[in-house]
Amino acid sequence: MQTDLIERTPEAYPYPLLIKSLLVSSLATTPDQEIVYRELRRHSYRDFYERVCRLAAALEALGVKRGDTVAIMDWDSHRYLEAFFAVPMMGAV
């Protein structure tokens, strides 16, 4: 399978841009920086990452696996943000 159909630009990242990369890079560079949700909730990137991992583990325990489709009945909440990262981190969509 040919994967280099378009020539890479010099500015291109040398790795795939994945949603989990947004969280993992912030965790690596500023683990104690806070994520603030509407002045109601505050989590450091470290704490938030742990929450995301717990949600991913809970979904896996419920039988969700790589490639499964997950519906999220929420929006604009701290729970939605956790699901936004947890679902693709475990390979589901």
Question: What is the meaning of each model-derived region?
Answer:
Residues 1-17:
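Flexible, non-catalytic linker and terminal segments flanking ANL/adenylate-forming cores
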Residues 2-3, 19, 32, 78:
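Generic secondary-structure boundary/loop-capping signal
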Residues 6-7, 19-24, 41, 59-60:
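Short, flexible segments with low predicted structural confidence
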Residues 88:
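Anion (oxyanion) recognition and catalysis
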Residues 91:
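Structured binding elements
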